[in-house]
Amino acid sequence: MTPEQYVQDKAAKSGSSFYYAFRFLPLPQRAAITAFYAFCREIDDVVDEVVDPSVAAIKLAWWRKEVANAYDGRSSHPAMQALMPHTAAYGIEASHLLAVIEGCEMDLQQSRYLDFAGLARYCHLVAGVVGEVASNIFG
């Protein structure tokens, strides 16, 4: 299976309507957003599906290394392999991907925010950064 097939399958199996909306985009944008969406699903699935928070934290640490490796030209995960050809064209920086990981990691540490600043930070990391990347891709 190619990295491109992997991210297509990941997006299709997610059950999200995003997958169908992406089908109407021009091919370069569709490929970029599908790869980015698959990356985000991978990260979110760690937090949602791994029961032991310490195991989830280890997996997220692995993803941090994978992001660094990918930007050094050494990606091993098909989601990153599918995403990397689009990073320069759409301004997708390692900091964007690391922010998504950081935001999802916050789910392991707390489920409720006691102040607006903490909530705003969480929302920025798990949704705002995703919107920034999507707007870069969509133009």
Regions found by a protein language model. Give the residues of each.
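Acidic catalytic motifs of isoprenoid enzymes
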Residues: 1-139
